[in-house]
């Protein structure tokens, strides 16, 4: 499997920064007339300071693309927090293990009760959230939570620490629909200052997974 870090290393980010600084209004007009950016340089031009005079055309174009793919739909989901147990130390996160806070993992039967209450409020899509802790947040626990929530929320995603493909399989079998993974920064020096202990401290391990929402069956 090709890690994202390997692909990222091939991107000439500083070149794109320079292209954004050097772009012209004529170039931005050309890109807008074409319909959408065709290259990374085009995208850099559209987020450049020179493009500030074209915010309304950009907004209208973005609106057309959004409606083309999703229609006039707003999908709401409710986060359901399963556990704040975590073995990582991350400077920005409330779950960080060095934070002096009470730790709790919600029992599965209480998770079911919470899902039922959210369904009564109209939510049909849930995001199950937990910190990274192999003892308290195991595959079996999360899979059981998914099963208990399904009668009340047919669309369930999870926000957990990145795992290998086989570890996601029980979540798929339980009825999970998607997974959300965040990469806080791709700037290595900044990453190291933000993640000081735990598995997440290792950059290659964090970069080997795609960033953002993806289907839970992405591994086949």
Predicted feature locations:
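Short, charged N-terminal helix-start/capping segments
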Residues: 11-17, 23, 86-97, 205-220
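Generic secondary-structure signature for well-ordered alpha-helical cores
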Residues: 30-33, 37, 64-71, 95, ...
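Core AdoMet radical
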Residues: 97-114, 118-220
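Canonical Radical SAM [4Fe-4S] cluster-binding loop centered on the CxxxCxxC motif
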Residues: 71, 75-110
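Short beta->alpha linker loops
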Residues: 61, 81, 162-163
């Amino acid at each position: 499997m090709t890690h994202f870090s390997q692909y990222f290393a091939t991107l000439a980010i500083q070149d794109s920064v320079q292209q954004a600084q050097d772009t012209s209004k004529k170039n931005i007009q050309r890109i807008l007339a074409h319909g959408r950016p065709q290259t990374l340089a085009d995208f850099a031009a559209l987020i450049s300071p020179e493009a500030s005079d074209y915010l309304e055309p950009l907004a209208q174009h973005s609106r057309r693309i959004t409606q083309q793919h999703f229609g006039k739909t707003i999908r709401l989901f409710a986060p359901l927090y399963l556990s704040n147990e975590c073995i990582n130390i991350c400077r920005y996160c409330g779950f960080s293990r060095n934070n002096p806070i009470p730790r709790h993992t919600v029992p599965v039967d209480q998770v079911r009760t919470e899902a039922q209450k959210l369904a009564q409020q109209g939510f049909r899509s849930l995001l199950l959230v937990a910190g990274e802790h192999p003892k308290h947040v195991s595959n079996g626990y999360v899979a059981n939570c998914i099963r208990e929530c399904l009668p009340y929320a047919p669309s369930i995603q999870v926000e957990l620490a990145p795992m290998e493909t086989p570890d996601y399989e029980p979540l798929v079998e339980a009825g999970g629909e998607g997974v959300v993974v965040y990469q806080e920064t791709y700037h290595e020096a900044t990453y190291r200052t933000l993640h000081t202990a735990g598995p997440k401290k290792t950059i290659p391990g964090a970069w080997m997974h795609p960033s953002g929402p993806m289907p839970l069956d992405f591994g086949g």
